C-alpha cells in the first residue's frame, strides 16, 4: 500500500500515464460527483464518492483492479497485508473481483487530503470510528505503470 500525503503529490506523478491522469482529473471534480452512484469509464476505470462509517471484519483483496482511495473528509484506519501472509476465507469471485481473507497486518491512519493506493497483491480492511467521505477509484491493473 502506498500513501500519498496530498492530492497535489498524486497529480504531480499522474501525468506519466493516461489512466493515472484520469484519476487525477477525477480528484479535481470530486465535489461534483453524486455520492452513492458508481460511474464507469469503460471496463478500465470506475469510481464513486461514498460516505463510510463501517468497520470491515475481513480483509478484501482484488485481482483485476487497483483501488485508489482519496480522503475528502475525516480520518480512517486501514489494516493491510500482502495476500500471501493472510488466510483465504472466501474464494475469489470473478464477477465482483473480490476475495476475502483474515489475519493480521499493519495499521495506518489516513486523513483528509491523503490518498492510498491498494495494489492487487495486497488486501486491506477499513477500521472506522466516525463518518468519512472519500472518492474510491478502481483502475484496471494490467494496464498500469506503477505511479510511485
Regions found by a protein language model. Give the residues of each.
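A short, N-terminal "cap"/entry segment at the start of jelly-roll beta-barrel domains
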Residues: 1-49, 56-61
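A generic structural signal for short beta-strands and their flanking turns/coil linkers
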Residues: 41-45, 64-66, 76, 133
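Short acidic (Asp/Glu) patches
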Residues: 48-62, 93-104, 119-122
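Short glycine/proline-enriched turns and hinge-like loops at secondary-structure junctions
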Residues: 61-62, 128-131
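Glycine- and acidic-residue-biased ligand/ion/polar-headgroup-sensing regions
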Residues: 64-66, 70-99
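A short hydrophobic beta-strand segment most commonly corresponding to one strand
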Residues: 68, 130-148
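Short, surface-exposed secondary-structure edge patches
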Residues: 68, 106-109
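Conserved metal-binding segment of the jelly-roll/cupin
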Residues: 108-128, 139
